[in-house]
């Protein structure tokens, strides 16, 4: 668990402390930040465990504005390890993966991918154009608030494409971000303590017979 976070904070999408030295104070600062990340990661993902219904037992009562996720069975959770698409197809899995990416400072990757999925379903030319510009300003242009890590050539191509937006404007960038998540964050998610706990089958305890 800790090793996964340590790798994450050194990954290009979420450096921990740029320009930090190697002295005792800086080392102590990095260790403190790493402990904070670990605590934050556990608290975020434990939320899903505490606020999810058991499989086949949806919550009843007043509807909440907040979306309720049905906690998967161990068998369902194990399917996520078979393919990245299996994880993304699960509402619970997607929510947990987003929390994991947030702990790695890479949440913009999944947000961009989801924005592209929504964009491709858009039929209206007017909406297509406005959504294309929003995706560009949010994720693509230099110093965008959620700037994704793609090459300059791809960014330039997108800047040209959005002038006459089509559903394929962001295809190349989406594929690159998908590959980045699949090859980096996804394997670390599968190694996380949270995911391993989901895959564990509950132990059946039997009470000793009275003599």
UniProtKB/Swiss-Prot annotation:
Subcellular location, record wording? Cell membrane; Cytoplasm; Nucleus, Nucleolus
PROSITE patterns for this protein: RGS
The ranges of region (Necessary to inhibit protein synthesis) come to 79-116
What GO molecular functions are on record for this protein? GTPase activator activity
Q: Name one Pfam family in it.
A: RGS
Record Gene3D superfamilies: 1.10.196.10, Regulator of G-protein Signalling 4, domain 2 (1.10.167.10)
Task: Tell me the segments the record calls region Necessary for membrane association.
Answer: 32-66
> What InterPro entries does the annotation carry?
RGS (IPR016137), RGS2_RGS (IPR034947), RGS_sf (IPR036305), RGS_subdom1/3 (IPR024066), RGS_subdomain_2 (IPR044926)
> Where does it primarily localize?
membrane
**Posttranslational modification, per the record?**
Phosphorylated by protein kinase C. Phosphorylation by PRKG1 leads to activation of RGS2 activity.
Q: Where is this region: Disordered?
A: 14-33, 49-71
Mention one GO biological process in which this protein takes part, according to its record: negative regulation of signal transduction
Q: Which domain of life is it from?
A: Eukaryota
User: What keywords tag this UniProt record?
Assistant: Cell cycle, Cell membrane, Cytoplasm, GTPase activation, Membrane, Nucleus, Phosphoprotein, Signal transduction inhibitor, Translation regulation
Signal peptide residues are none
What sequence ranges are listed for the domain RGS? 83-199
- Note the subunit structure: Interacts with GNAQ. Does not interact with GNAI1 and GNAI3. Interacts with EIF2B5. Interacts with PRKG1 (isoform alpha).
Function summary = Regulates G protein-coupled receptor signaling cascades. Inhibits signal transduction by increasing the GTPase activity of G protein alpha subunits, thereby driving them into their inactive GDP-bound form. It is involved in the negative regulation of the angiotensin-activated signaling pathway. Plays a role in the regulation of blood pressure in response to signaling via G protein-coupled receptors and GNAQ. Plays a role in regulating the constriction and relaxation of vascular smooth muscle. Binds EIF2B5 and blocks its activity, thereby inhibiting the translation of mRNA into protein.
* Protein name per the record: Regulator of G-protein signaling 2
List the gene name. Answer: RGS2
């Amino acid at each position: 668990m800790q090793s996964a976070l340590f790798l994450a904070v050194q990954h290009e999408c979420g450096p921990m402390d740029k320009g930090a030295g190697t002295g005792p104070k800086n080392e102590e600062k990095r260790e403190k930040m790493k402990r904070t990340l670990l605590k934050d990661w556990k608290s975020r993902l434990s939320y899903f465990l505490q606020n999810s219904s058991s499989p086949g037992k949806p919550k009843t009562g007043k509807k909440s504005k907040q979306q309720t996720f049905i906690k998967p069975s161990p068998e369902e959770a194990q399917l996520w390890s078979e393919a990245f698409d299996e994880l993304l197809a699960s509402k619970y899995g997607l929510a947990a993966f987003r929390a994991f990416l947030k702990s790695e400072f890479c949440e913009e990757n999944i947000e961009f991918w989801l924005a592209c999925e929504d964009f491709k379903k858009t039929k209206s030319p007017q909406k297509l154009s406005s959504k294309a510009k929003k995706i560009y300003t949010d994720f693509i242009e230099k110093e965008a608030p959620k700037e994704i890590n793609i090459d300059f050539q791809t960014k330039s191509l997108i800047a040209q494409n959005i002038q006459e937006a089509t559903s394929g404007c962001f295809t190349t960038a989406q594929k690159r971000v998908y590959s980045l998540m699949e090859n980096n964050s996804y394997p670390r998610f599968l190694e996380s303590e949270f995911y391993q706990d989901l895959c564990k089958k509950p132990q059946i305890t039997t009470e000793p017979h009275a003599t």
